[in-house]
Amino acid sequence: MSGEVSYYAGQTAEEAVARIYDRSGRPVAARRWRGVSGEIDLIAREGAEVIFIEVKKSKSHAAAAARLSRRQMDRIYGAASEFLAGEPRGQLTASRFDVALVDALGRVEIIENAFAA
């Protein structure tokens, strides 16, 4: 897939995931939020909790999941920490990290709290 095609495929996947969160009462507050440490695809809210969402698209859900590396997770953690610094409760703000996997047919699988050990 060319760079431009990949970019638009990623945007389409993010839009599909954002609609799922919005429709389930967890409004998306930011898209492609960028901090010094990295970028977070989507940031949603569920009550007082902040949800950081990484969207991965590939031919299958398994292939999409395999594209998430430890290094990338570390960058997402860093960016999330920067985002939380701007929240009223700072680092004490309730938060979680979801991963949304999108396959070639546009089917979405959301893994809530995916970064939990």
From Swiss-Prot:
For this UniProt entry, the molecular function terms from Gene Ontology, in alphabetical order, are: nucleic acid binding
**What SUPFAM superfamilies does the record point to?**
Restriction endonuclease-like
Tell me one Pfam family matched here.
UPF0102
Question: What's the family?
Answer: Belongs to the UPF0102 family.
Under the heading PANTHER family, the entry gives:
UPF0102 PROTEIN YRAN
Protein name in UniProt: UPF0102 protein Rsph17029_0461
